[in-house]
Amino acid sequence: MSENTRSDTHSETYAELAAVGPYGVRPGHALITMVEPRPGHEYAYNRWYEDDHFYAGAMAMPWMSAGRRWVATRDLQLLRLPEKSAVAQPVTAGCYLTTYWVTDGRYDDHMKWTVAINKRLNRDGRVYRDRTHVFTAFQDHEATVYRDGAAGPRDFHALDHPYAGLVLEVVDAESPEQRAELLEWLVSRHLPKRVAGSPAAMVTVFRPTPLPGDRMTYVKQVEGVDTRLTLLWFLEADPRECWDPYFTGLDAAVTEAGLGRVELLAPFVPTIPGTDKYVDQLR
């Protein structure tokens, strides 16, 4: 590498950055993004995201330690609850979900890079326009509930472990104070009971954070930053096989507790990277 190139890319700075700050393995933060390609653009969107954006717009960035992409075919979309959702209108919108882990304590550092790199990608014509962000937010990790205690994969393994499915759950409380009560109830009572003997190996719980003011304009500002919780259920079975016994009625259980309301319960299966599998099953 020439001296000019090293100077242009600030190569010497990387050694300084690597020597300071948190560098654990826990997912202290997440990017959770549910997107709907516009009709007729399904194949092109899928190839753009998998061949370019998943890497250049996410995984190549500092402190983003893991990523996994998920898809909801039409039959999975039709399982979603509730019929009228504050998150997705219609509730079937958002057939692709991508989840990323960000190293604990590195949120601010990562955000500076992600805003800059996405502006660069946009300037260079590497942003696909024919898509809608249905639910996109960076999130702070609150808790993880494990079915099998200390045995099995941890949350930092979750996006690399070959789970057969994932369920995205979004719960809204009425106030910040009620959200704290909701979190306590979920972690200490509701989730341990739900995962016991179920195909769900773990549930991670996050709270959304506001996007920076200089974010890309095609991503709307995050709603519910003081009142919302986002849950990811990692399943060892196809969600179609376990939906009725384990997830039907889950929204009613939250409502009955009087601590919030489920605004989205949506099942997904993992994509097969580098392929167009499932694209013909979205509509």
Name every feature range the model reports, one short phrase each.
Residues 2-283:
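Macromolecular interaction modules
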